[in-house]
Amino acid sequence: MSTRTASAGDIKEGSYIMIDNMPCRVVEVEKSKTGKHGSAKARIVGIGVIDGVKRTIVVPTDAAVEVPVIEKFTAQVISISGDSVQLMDLRNYQTFEIPSSYIEDEAKGKLEPGVQVEVWDVAGYKKIMRTR
């Protein structure tokens, strides 16, 4: 799982963050200053890249948070069998399987053997994002 750290105060909408050990796309950030002796807090709302679940985290703005490193690459569909898709990575020609639940909705209808797809490798999870 490849991640790096960033300050919670530097997180912006549209960026990615790890919430509950799942990579999430940030959809809302609220920063609030607390009382006289308190520290500023950031409320970050994200939607899971892999599962689409909405998650929320509240942390001090100076706290370190994990940011996933997203690796994008092209793969070719070898076969489709029921609940999984077998792919070949076009960088090193290794084959691997992805469950059907890890396929973006817009790409589901377009998959057939021989089609090239864009795959995101995020924190150890692989997901088909679109066809090429």
From Swiss-Prot:
Superkingdom of origin: Archaea
Molecular function GO terms recorded: ribosome binding; RNA binding; translation elongation factor activity; translation initiation factor activity
Localisation: Cytoplasm
Sites bearing Hypusine, chain numbering: 36
Cellular component per GO, a single term: cytoplasm
Record-level GO BP terms: positive regulation of translational elongation; positive regulation of translational termination
Disulphide bridges, residue numbers: none
Chief location: cytoplasm
Pfam families, alphabetized: eIF-5a, IF5A-like_N
Keywords: Cytoplasm, Hypusine, Initiation factor, Protein biosynthesis
SUPFAM superfamilies per the UniProt record, alphabetical: Nucleic acid-binding proteins, Translation proteins SH3-like domain
Keyword Cytoplasm appears in the UniProt entry: yes
CDD domains to which the protein is assigned, alphabetical: S1_aIF5A
Its job: Functions by promoting the formation of the first peptide bond.
Similarity comment: Belongs to the eIF-5A family.
Name the UniProt record assigns to this protein: Translation initiation factor 5A
Originating gene: eIF5A
